[in-house]
Structures are given as structure tokens and as C-alpha cells.
């Protein structure tokens, strides 16, 4: 609202308001028409269905965009005009010409036109005449007013300050209409605010992410206890657990930007990312770069995906195998990849939304230096093959998951027998033993595990040279995720 008001004060007659919220922009225009010039001035609303309607009175023969612009140009006195989904794209030379004429005709006359659309489609010829404003989604104050209005309407008891502010934080990223729908659902069958209410808000944000097509909502299934080892990483995450809270925001504590997990395949990088959303109680969205590059305009799709995840913030954005997608740029390579890479770096550096980026990488030698330099991510972690103690923990986790009592197994022996194994290989050994024993209608024994272990050649043997190279590369470039 402030940017629109400042643009009008600055004398801009043509404003392009990029927003999904036509009703909210229209309410703002109503407020401006009543108050901006001290006395009320006319308010016109145009759509291709109704044409131009000024203060409730239809202007004849104005459904055609050019004729609507002519009517605004020849109107008398000051006024505000909201044009919904006005066709400003390429292929409309007569509309473009009339817009440029309108700019000169309305300048310094107190008449202002607000072109409203969720997509930014500006003709090249008119870019200098049109002032672009990305209308921000409701902030905390506006969300609290919507909440208060709903509670009064239904005659319910007002929420206390703590509950209201937590609710406002959870509702960030939704439009005013979406907030109204969610609040109505949440309080339809309850009088108090409970954890289930916040799960409903999470479900609404999941629904929003599906509309973009390249963001996948990842439900919170794993906890930090499901990871064996990674003590340094776990400590880092726990220390930042409360930084997305209302209290931390009010205290001015810097919000974490993100982390990069790189290292050997099969060591649990993806699992570690999935536990962040559970630990921090934030929704997790995975950006599917294959889907991005499968569209007609990968650059536009990628930038829309970033805006979409900002819209559902606070959230965690997971970029898997970043070296093959965003970080796959090479100098002199594909121009679209270059623009995506540049756009991502700029977004990481300047983003103000509450989005934590969790990226993983296997082929770390492919990562451009710009990705791993300080300032992009808060920390770069190297994930190595698990040590003996960590392998014991991993065996415990997967034995329990397969309904086996770890106390019945010699975990020390199993850990020593699987030296050089990664977490995925240990998991598969336990699963294979469970399948074999089930086929024979009996419980899993340690001998089952011994047999599977003896028949397995781990990745550390088949790819010994590559793993040595990965370790050497990461030695001075990243912090080990484990203490040992």
C-alpha cells in the first residue's frame, strides 16, 4: 500500500499492480478515491465482462480495452481507475499505443490507472511509462485485523496475544481471501486454538504449492532421532530451532538463510533435510528441477517457484542435487541455465522472506565457487561415511523400524563388519534380512545379517578413488557433519 501511495504522490499516472488479490487492490483504490485528495473523487472499475463502471454507473461501449482507455482519457477531473486483467501483452499494438497516449494525457491531472494482474505482461514499448508495483501479501497487522474481524463476527472469545501472533505467523504467505477461508475452517468446529488448527493451515499451504507444478510438499515423517550420527549438524540445527518464532523475529535475531549438505551418496543427506521441517515445525517443499527444465520457459518457471515458496513462508525449500540443477551452470553453457543460476544467487543473497534453503549435493566437484562461498549459505557441511559408533546407531534405528529388538544383536560386531558402508547400505542389509526371514516364517537372526553383509560389496570399494577425491576436495571447504 505504501509503495502505491508513494507512486501516486510521485505523479505516476499508470501503475501495474502485480497481485492475485483484485478485491484487496479494489478496496485500496476505494480508500484512495475517498481520502487521497481530501474530497472524494470518482472510482472506475474495468473488466472485459462489465466494461468500465464509474461509481456504480456503467460507461457505454467500454468492454473493448481501447475504448475503455479513451473513456478514461476524456473523463473530467481527478479519479482512480482499476483495470482487471487488462490485455497489455504482445500482439496488441493499438492497446500499447493508447496506453502511451494515456500516460501523457493523464500526467499531472490527478487521474491514476491501476492495472491489476497476477502476471507481469508489459509491452516493450510502454515499459518506461508504466510503474510496476508487486503488491505485498497481508502483513502481521492486517492478518491480525482479519482474525479479529472473524472472531467478532462469530461472537467468539478473542484470542490471547500469544495465540494471535502465532496464528498470524502461520498464516503469512496467504492472500486475504485465503486467510478468511482458512480461519473460517479452523474455527468452524472448535472454540480454542490447538495444534490441529496449525496442521489445517499447513494443509492449505500444501494445496497452494501443488498449483505451481514444480513444488512438492514433503510431509513431516522423520525426526532428528531417525538419523545416526551427524552430531555437529544436529547441534547446529537445534541451536537454530527457535529462530523462526515470533519472539526471535521481534528480537531482531537474523533469520538463517540455509545450509548445503554435500558428500558421499547414500549417507543420509536427504533424510537430514526432511528432519529439519519436523524439528523446526515448518512445512518442507522440494523444488523439482527436472520439472522446471521440462517447461517451455525454465527461467520463468523457476522464478515463479521461488515466489511461490516465499508466498507460503515460513518454510524450508529443499533443492536436491543442486549441482545438477541450479548449480549446473558452466561458463559458456546454456543461456537459460546461466540466467537461472544468476537469479538463484541474487535471490539467496537478497531474499527477505522466511525461507530456509536446504540443498544437497553428491558430485561436489561440479559446484561453482559462487554457490559455496560465505554469504550464500550459513554453513556448508560435509557428510562422510559413518564411523563405527554411527554405524551402531544406524543399525539400531533400522532394526527397530523393522520390528527387531536391537538388544538381541551384537551391534559392535555388526558395526565392525560393515566398515566403509554408508547408511543406505546398512538399511538395505537389515531390510534384506527381514525379507529373507519373513519368507521362512521366522524372526530375523544375526546370522541373516551376517549372510547379507558377506554378499555385499559396498560403494566405498567399487568407487574407492572417487570417494577419496570427494574427501580430499571437502577437507578444507566444509564442516564435517559428524564430530569424529
Q: What annotation goes with each model-predicted range?
A:
Residues 165-217:
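Interdomain "pre-motor" coupling segment immediately N-terminal to P-loop NTPase/helicase cores
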